[in-house]
């Protein structure tokens, strides 16, 4: 009797453990930022407050993009399991620890990708589906398989796929693309190198041990810090484009300038005097920078007309 009673809790524990392993493959925090950026693109694509049907499309698009992004993350874990096992930052991943087989991981990734593509095809539109699939290929194949192990410019070139979420969101709501989503894409594209290189600075030993040609490993600490500073300056200029192009108003411009000065300040201090603590702070600030920048753009989209006294 005692063994019978003990079975359900044990089975539940096993099921929960397996669920956590598959969930970890999807890199939830990264995917959350992807969906957030896509959602910003969706909301900016609609003048005023979205209608109820538009909210339905936005929900379906968010689910579809989330599924495909999760599939790309799982495929990345599959390909990089040997590399991940050599790095402290990633050694905990289920594939690196051998907790999930290659077949399980690949099947999971294919299932997620197929489900996401189906959602986008049925409830959103074909343009969004194909753009999302192209983004999947860009990250899972071009970046993960070809670029990351081959060149220190992997982050720069591969960053194009990571910059696509606002374009996907815009396409979902409009069914077409203009200049606006590509401006948002450019901002993320320029944000990606200083963001990841700040991380790579204090994880350089990890990357060297794994044999990955990240910029601090191939070109050294000083060169990487200079590149972070230069990219941050260019990024600052790019963040002003929504105002210049007429996508936003003064509220966004003030926020973009404040955040840009903050990011440049972190990059400048890191360039002048390196420390691991400074690199960590710069990395963390970069996340806040992008999140708050897009949040300010969204607030300006809705509050701007009220502040200007226009409907």
Swiss-Prot record:
<dbReference type="GO" id="GO:0005886">
    <property type="term" value="C:plasma membrane"/>
</dbReference>
<protein>
    <recommendedName>
        <fullName>Protoheme IX farnesyltransferase</fullName>
        <ecNumber>2.5.1.141</ecNumber>
    </recommendedName>
</protein>
<feature type="transmembrane region" description="Helical">
    <location>
        <begin position="108"/>
        <end position="128"/>
    </location>
</feature>
<feature type="transmembrane region" description="Helical">
    <location>
        <begin position="287"/>
        <end position="307"/>
    </location>
</feature>
<dbReference type="Pfam" id="PF01040">
    <property type="entry name" value="UbiA"/>
</dbReference>
<feature type="transmembrane region" description="Helical">
    <location>
        <begin position="30"/>
        <end position="50"/>
    </location>
</feature>
<feature type="transmembrane region" description="Helical">
    <location>
        <begin position="233"/>
        <end position="253"/>
    </location>
</feature>
<keyword id="KW-0997">Cell inner membrane</keyword>
<keyword id="KW-0808">Transferase</keyword>
<dbReference type="InterPro" id="IPR000537">
    <property type="entry name" value="UbiA_prenyltransferase"/>
</dbReference>
<keyword id="KW-0350">Heme biosynthesis</keyword>
<keyword id="KW-0472">Membrane</keyword>
<keyword id="KW-0812">Transmembrane</keyword>
<dbReference type="GO" id="GO:0008495">
    <property type="term" value="F:protoheme IX farnesyltransferase activity"/>
</dbReference>
<feature type="transmembrane region" description="Helical">
    <location>
        <begin position="129"/>
        <end position="149"/>
    </location>
</feature>
<feature type="transmembrane region" description="Helical">
    <location>
        <begin position="182"/>
        <end position="202"/>
    </location>
</feature>
<dbReference type="InterPro" id="IPR006369">
    <property type="entry name" value="Protohaem_IX_farnesylTrfase"/>
</dbReference>
<feature type="transmembrane region" description="Helical">
    <location>
        <begin position="153"/>
        <end position="173"/>
    </location>
</feature>
<keyword id="KW-1133">Transmembrane helix</keyword>
<dbReference type="InterPro" id="IPR044878">
    <property type="entry name" value="UbiA_sf"/>
</dbReference>
<keyword id="KW-1003">Cell membrane</keyword>
<comment type="similarity">
    <text>Belongs to the UbiA prenyltransferase family. Protoheme IX farnesyltransferase subfamily.</text>
</comment>
<comment type="pathway">
    <text>Porphyrin-containing compound metabolism; heme O biosynthesis; heme O from protoheme: step 1/1.</text>
</comment>
<dbReference type="InterPro" id="IPR030470">
    <property type="entry name" value="UbiA_prenylTrfase_CS"/>
</dbReference>
<feature type="transmembrane region" description="Helical">
    <location>
        <begin position="55"/>
        <end position="75"/>
    </location>
</feature>
<dbReference type="GO" id="GO:0048034">
    <property type="term" value="P:heme O biosynthetic process"/>
</dbReference>
<comment type="function">
    <text>Converts heme B (protoheme IX) to heme O by substitution of the vinyl group on carbon 2 of heme B porphyrin ring with a hydroxyethyl farnesyl side group.</text>
</comment>
């Amino acid at each position: 009797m005692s063994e019978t009673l003990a079975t359900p809790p044990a089975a539940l524990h096993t099921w929960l453990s397996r669920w956590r392993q598959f969930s970890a493959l999807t890199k939830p925090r990264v995917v959350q930022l992807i969906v957030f950026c896509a959602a910003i693109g969706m909301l900016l694509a609609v003048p005023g407050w979205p209608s109820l049907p538009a909210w339905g499309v936005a929900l379906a698009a968010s689910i579809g993009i989330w599924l495909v992004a999760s599939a790309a993350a799982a495929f990345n874990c599959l390909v990089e399991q040997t590399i991940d096992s050599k790095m402290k930052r990633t050694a905990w991943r289920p594939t690196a620890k051998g907790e999930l087989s290659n077949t399980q991981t690949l099947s999971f990734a294919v299932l997620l990708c197929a489900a996401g593509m189906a959602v986008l095809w049925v409830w959103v539109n074909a343009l969004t589906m194909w753009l999302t699939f192209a983004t999947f290929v860009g990250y899972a194949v071009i970046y993960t398989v070809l670029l990351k192990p081959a060149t220190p410019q992997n982050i720069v070139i591969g960053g194009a796929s990571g910059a696509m979420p606002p374009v996907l969101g815009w396409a979902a709501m409009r069914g077409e693309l203009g200049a606006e989503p590509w401006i948002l894409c450019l901002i993320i594209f320029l944000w990606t190198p200083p963001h990841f290189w700040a991380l790579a600075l204090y994880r350089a030993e990890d990357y060297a041990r794994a044999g990955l040609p990240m910029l601090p490993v191939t070109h050294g600490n000083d060169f990487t810090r200079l590149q972070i500073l230069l990219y941050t300056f260019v990024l600052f200029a790019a963040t002003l484009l929504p105002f210049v192009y007429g996508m936003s108003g003064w509220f966004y411009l003030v926020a973009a300038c404040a955040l840009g000065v903050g990011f440049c300040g972190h990059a400048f201090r890191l360039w002048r005097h390196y420390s691991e603590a400074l690199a960590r702070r710069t990395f963390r600030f970069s996340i806040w920078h992008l999140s708050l920048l897009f949040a300010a753009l969204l607030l300006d989209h809705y509050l701007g007309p009220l502040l200007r006294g226009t409907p």
